[in-house]
Amino acid sequence: MKEFYLTVEQIGDSIFERYIDSNGRERTREVEYKPSLFAHCPESQATKYFDIYGKPCTRKLFANMRDASQWIKRMEDIGLEALGMDDFKLAYLSDTYNYEIKYDHTKIRVANFDIEVTSPDGFPEPSQAKHPIDAITHYDSIDDRFYVFDLLNSPYGNVEEWSIEIAAKLQEQGGDEVPSEIIDKIIYMPFDNEKELLMEYLNFWQQKTPVILTGWNVESFDIPYVYNRIKNIFGESTAKRLSPHRKTRVKVIENMYGSREIITLFGISVLDYIDLYKKFSFTNQPSYSLDYISEFELNVGKLKYDGPISKLRESNHQRYISYNIIDVYRVLQIDAKRQFINLSLDMGYYAKIQIQSVFSPIKTWDAIIFNSLKEQNKVIPQGRSHPVQPYPGAFVKEPIPNRYKYVMSFDLTSLYPSIIRQVNISPETIAGTFKVAPLHDYINAVAERPSDVYSCSPNGMMYYKDRDGVVPTEITKVFNQRKEHKGYMLAAQRNGEIIKEALHNPNLSVDEPLDVDYRFDFSDEIKEKIKKLSAKSLNEMLFRAQRTEVAGMTAQINRKLLINSLYGALGNVWFRYYDLRNATAITTFGQMALQWIERKVNEYLNEVCGTEGEAFVLYGDTDSIYVSADKIIDKVGESKFRDTNHWVDFLDKFARERMEPAIDRGFREMCEYMNNKQHLMFMDREAIAGPPLGSKGIGGFWTGKKRYALNVWDMEGTRYAEPKLKIMGLETQKSSTPKAVQKALKECIRRMLQEGEESLQEYFKEFEKEFRQLNYISIASVSSANNIAKYDVGGFPGPKCPFHIRGILTYNRAIKGNIDAPQVVEGEKVYVLPLREGNPFGDKCIAWPSGTEITDLIKDDVLHWMDYTVLLEKTFIKPLEGFTSAAKLDYEKKASLFDMFDF
């Protein structure tokens, strides 16, 4: 096997690298790296190096990194450009690994850990680390073992050893229900004192030093607490042993929520899983506690316990250790589903960067472009900062709030990346500018063609067509990767639907799941075999298909994010290739493209349907248009269709054979009009939506921009056995909406779209009765605890105090002096409940940390005084009124004169 790096650090004048050698063994080396940089030279001078603008450059080799850095400063002082990669870690990786890196993830030691600290005086502050660490669970990916370090004797009480036998038992049998699949992987180590525990953990750490260190919120809590605790007990030099290079950096980060200490352990890549989840999951959650996210992702939360966590070790030490183990296991389970660690490795090795740099699109793209240009002997420009300036955003069409029975949507493939490639937008391809006409003149093709020579964008920018830009070239590579992974995702999705169909009539035989590659569409032979499988085998295959779909979805979405982040980087003042003109060219072209095709689609469908001036495009947003298909169905006659599948088939065929070619012709005209380098505006049919044939359902509705719901039968060629709701921007999607209300509103929408007004009214009556019986947490609204101090006047709300901040202040007064009650942390989410007048808390609401039960100290009073009427009105009825008003429906049956009679 070829060598590949694990971590790389610059310490002084040396590069310290951990790597896997050709024999598959982990090694460490210190390299006195000699970097190269570049300067412009006269055109008469012979050289093989040129900058991205074609200017000749001369290479300068330095004896060490210090000399190179000093040369850059001298060049800046005299106003000359020092070209080349000034991040010497990236330059070293490029020089050392001048080939595509094929890494073996089984050789990369990933540690997932969690510590427990008993603190009798509130939250244990990691920067102080004044309380003993009394439990550590550390999972090692290479060993596939959970190493548990347990402190038996501490200042806060002595405890008995944890029992693996009790841990394995069901809770009804007095056990902890630690899953059977990990019981045999647990290595339990009890210690009599903390010094012994920490020293043994440190020795273990050095023997099995992580390459990737993860866990839930480890960067903010676990890592600084362990580091500072070891420093407090043994001294700083001992704490630095956590770094394989004995080098650490302590950094205090200040933000609107206060300050926190970040410890960098040189030689270890920290990928805090809470940060991975926030960046890559594309979900907005009401709480990012591990318990909440576990419930959301796995349908199982953390291990439950009675009383405050600060008392758990003393009251139930057995549960305390099992709780610690399960916390680590939950993060492993989430990653098994989401694959964010593997995704980070893929991105990191593709770009040849430190793996933790995947959080920075600027760093990622800087490395990708540098490595590509280096192969061509092209030299990257010097990075400079620029003043921040705004530029236009995307176009969003204002919809008419209404119900829409039959709808088709069409989506431009990777709009901004495609614009960059079509127009050939790059810093070095700028050819000049032309006199700009109003944007609507370009949309309607009444303005003069901008240029017969150069590729143009309607913001006035012109680009060369006779050369490939650096940015379009690199984006094309990642674009092709995204297309590949999206193909895997959609194939797995289609395969999953085939398996679901077979599950309606499974075989009773005893068999095994088929060994197939779910990334590719099943052959006819496999489809026939699937029909003969048992339910057990089919369910196993469905599980694998869904995992493949999730892996493909994550990979393609994150490549999409990477691609689109390059567009954003072009407008980022810290990016090496920053140019405001280019960022503006991209978004302005996008605005024109969407409105151009709206005009073309309306013209085409008016011609097909024999109408005049009809606005068939009801909505558009950034890269998508939504087309009302009612008149298309009417043209054929709704009665002609046998069933729902029949009309979906018809619209599918109409979109594929008639509309997509018409759309393509329209975009080709635009490409010719703008004289672009190549035609890449490809718009495909996305959703086909409508009610079941013969039902009273409305099919879909819009309440405003970015707020709509559709009953979808087919998405990008994947036909659903049961329709799926596509809901955007409505309260069902908002993290502030209570969980139970989200579910109820979604059911209301389903009934509106699929069954109609009468069904909606029935459910409204049901939920109104059910609401008061629901668990208080499931109906509490959620808000972020921002700017508490701003509105805090002696513990009471000041002028213009927001409702949820008022609730936080109420809570703080109620728990004052009680250190066991969970504290509200600035910036975190809180649950909010309204209270009836006359309550003992003296205010109209109360709020406490989300993801937790309200403290027993005040729970009974809160539940007695909570205002169900206000809560139902604000969280459920008000948003439902918005839906039904737009859709011209009534959620409650209205009395009429006819109700007085029997007929």
Curated annotation (Swiss-Prot):
GO molecular function annotation: 3'-5' exonuclease activity; DNA binding; DNA-directed DNA polymerase activity; metal ion binding; nucleotide binding
Site feature: Essential for viral replication: 714
Result when mutating residue 561 to A: No effect on the ability to recognize damaged DNA. Increase in probability of nucleotide incorporation
Region (Binding of DNA in B-conformation): 705-708
Organism: Escherichia phage RB69
Keyword annotations of the record: DNA replication, DNA-binding, DNA-directed DNA polymerase, Exonuclease, Hydrolase, Magnesium, Metal-binding, Multifunctional enzyme, Nuclease, Nucleotidyltransferase, Transferase, Viral DNA replication
Binding site for substrate: 414-416, 482, 560
Presence of keyword Phosphoprotein: no
Catalysis: reaction(s): DNA(n) + a 2'-deoxyribonucleoside 5'-triphosphate = DNA(n+1) + diphosphate
Known function: Replicates the viral genomic DNA. This polymerase possesses two enzymatic activities: DNA synthesis (polymerase) and an exonucleolytic activity that degrades single-stranded DNA in the 3'- to 5'-direction for proofreading purpose.
EC number: 2.7.7.7, 3.1.11.-
Keyword Magnesium included in the entry's annotation: yes
Cross-referenced InterPro entries: DNA-dir_DNA_pol_B, DNA-dir_DNA_pol_B_CS, DNA-dir_DNA_pol_B_exonuc, DNA-dir_DNA_pol_B_multi_dom, DNA/RNA_pol_sf, DNA_pol_palm_dom_sf, DNA_pol_type-B, DPOL_T4
Substitution effect: residue 621 to A: Drastic decrease in the efficiency of incorporation of dGMP
Family of the protein in this entry: Belongs to the DNA polymerase type-B family.
Protein's UniProt name: DNA-directed DNA polymerase
Assembly and oligomerization: Part of the replicase complex that includes the DNA polymerase, the polymerase clamp, the clamp loader complex, the single-stranded DNA binding protein, and the primase/helicase. Interacts with the polymerase clamp; this interaction constitutes the polymerase holoenzyme.
Region named 3'-5'exonuclease: 103-340
Cofactor names: Mg(2+)
Gene expressing this chain: 43
Region Polymerase, annotated ranges: 380-903
